[in-house]
Amino acid sequence: MKSSKTGILLANLGTPDTPSPKAISRYLKEFLSDPRVVDLPRWKWLPLLNGIILPIRSRRIAKNYGAIWTEQGSPLFAITQKQKALLTEFFQQRQQNVIIEIGMTYGNPSMQYAIDNLIEQKVDKIIVLPLYPQYSSTTTAPVFDVFAQALKRHRHIVPFEFIHSYHLDENYIEALVKSIKVRLKNDEFLLFSFHGIPKRYEQEGDFYRPQCEQTAQAVVQKLGLKKEQWRLCFQSRFGSEPWLQPYTDKFLETAAQQGITKLAVICPGFSADCLETLEEIKEENKRIFLAYGGESYHYIPALNDSPEHIACLGNLLLKRMTI
């Protein structure tokens, strides 16, 4: 009897091909043109994006990308490649017939490329794993959109399963707890920083915030932290309309006034370190905190390719392996 072959799609946001302004502009154009990300009327948004935002922003952040770039490419891409390799080993050790592809919602390797490869290798089922523990209409939903679009090229739609979120997955919570325990000092305040979304999106039905809160609550409960020992904030706001609050940078400006002078920050919504964690949180926000009276600040890395994270993702997928 022929054993079934499962295709696994590891989906993440994406990254520029190089840290050059041209490549960054090309990537940002694809990303910020998605109505799931910015839902303003096209006639209003696209001229603003193409005429002002892309020329200015791509040049401005090229230096930031250059500072974190590695020989393997962007950190997000390099780490996702490691996750793929380690997950392949995970399934080989369990004698599972699995093919894993990486598909980015924006940029390369594209979702289309990943799907075409899986179907060409005649997989019997595809499991789509968006590498976002907390669901958002700005991240998880675009994965579904692009995945569905990629299937349009094929006459036969392979049976598939789409993992919606895993914000309370036991292995995910335990991986966060272990990572924090080995890095958090007794006298440090713990800040959970999640990527923000416009407040309006929440009002329109995006339930991202409750999932972020549930993740943080589950972690602090296992850590035994009191309410005055931690806080949840939202980072990376963009544009002029209100986003989810409290804002990470604004909290850091006032933390010392509240008696918080030693701080560690973790970003549980990121499955791999990237520009927002390595530059914004680790470097830029550290400067803010210290400038406003903070004494010590350090960033707790994303789960990345840690053994606990690979076990978390592997077991999450293993549960869905049967057709």
UniProtKB/Swiss-Prot annotation:
Its EC number is 4.98.1.1. One of its GO terms (biological process) is heme biosynthetic process. One of its GO terms (molecular function) is ferrochelatase activity. Its main location: cytoplasm. InterPro entries: Ferrochelatase (IPR001015), Ferrochelatase_AS (IPR019772), Ferrochelatase_C (IPR033644), Ferrochelatase_N (IPR033659). Fe cation binds at H195, E276. Pfam families: Ferrochelatase. It comes from the Bacteria. SUPFAM superfamilies: Chelatase (SSF53800). It catalyses: heme b + 2 H(+) = protoporphyrin IX + Fe(2+). Pathway: Porphyrin-containing compound metabolism; protoheme biosynthesis; protoheme from protoporphyrin-IX: step 1/1. It is found in: Cytoplasm. Keywords: Cytoplasm, Heme biosynthesis, Iron, Lyase, Metal-binding, Porphyrin biosynthesis. GO terms for cellular component: cytoplasm. PROSITE patterns: FERROCHELATASE. It is an enzyme of class 4 (lyase). NCBIfam families: hemH (TIGR00109). Catalyzes the ferrous insertion into protoporphyrin IX. Belongs to the ferrochelatase family. This is Ferrochelatase.
